[in-house]
Swiss-Prot record:
Compartments reported by the entry: Plastid, Chloroplast
Lineage of producing organism: Eukaryota, Viridiplantae, Streptophyta, Zygnematophyceae, Zygnematophycidae
Subunit structure: Part of the 50S ribosomal subunit.
Alphabetical list of PANTHER family matching this protein: 50S/60S RIBOSOMAL PROTEIN L16, LARGE RIBOSOMAL SUBUNIT PROTEIN UL16M
InterPro entries in the record: Ribosomal_uL16, Ribosomal_uL16_bact-type, Ribosomal_uL16_CS, Ribosomal_uL16_dom, Ribosomal_uL16_sf
Claim: Secreted is one of the keywords in the record: no
Domain of life: Eukaryota
Organism this protein belongs to: Spirogyra maxima
Protein name as annotated: Large ribosomal subunit protein uL16c
Keywords carried by this UniProt record: Chloroplast, Plastid, Ribonucleoprotein, Ribosomal protein
GO cellular component: chloroplast; mitochondrial large ribosomal subunit
Sample GO molecular function, one term: rRNA binding
Length: 143
């Protein structure tokens, strides 16, 4: 599962997810992509489950890029602990995802296989997603 090798600080504020993704919202490497339609935290386990599902379905064909990284630590307190005595220990890692963010990209396989693989991965995500295809026009005319 994905997690940072080291961080400057062990714990973070929860924060809030306002607006839409302004970065990472366009296809960069592959031909097909899975795009988030809602804002949410996506855990490293969910990212890994989606990756496994897609690679198993594609069967060694094509290439997969994971476009999100879980860099936010989520802390939890032990069960049945009294209030106070500080913030809990980091328990797992999440990626903060806003609407429009590309989660996965694929290429080297047919659209039908890519669509089916992404649908399986989408079931493992806690948000609504959509399948998008890249425009193949490499050099747009400047008219």
């Amino acid at each position: 599962m994905l997690s940072p090798r080291r961080t400057k600080f062990r714990k973070q504020h929860r924060g809030r997810m306002k607006g839409v993704a302004t970065r990472g919202n366009q296809i960069a490497f592959g031909r097909f992509a899975l795009q988030a339609m809602e804002a949410s935290w996506i855990t490293s386990r969910q990212i890994e489950a989606g990756r496994r599902a897609m690679t198993r379905y594609a069967r060694r064909g094509g290439k997969l890029w994971i476009k999100i990284f879980p860099d936010k630590p989520i802390t939890m307190r032990p069960a049945e602990t009294r209030m106070g005595s500080g913030k809990g220990a980091p328990e797992y890692w999440v990626a903060v995802v806003k609407p429009g963010r590309i989660l996965y990209e694929m290429s080297g396989i047919s659209e039908t296989i890519a669509r089916a693989a992404m649908r399986i991965a989408a079931y493992k995500m806690p948000i609504k997603t959509r399948f998008i295809v890249a425009n193949l026009s490499k050099n747009p005319t400047n008219d």
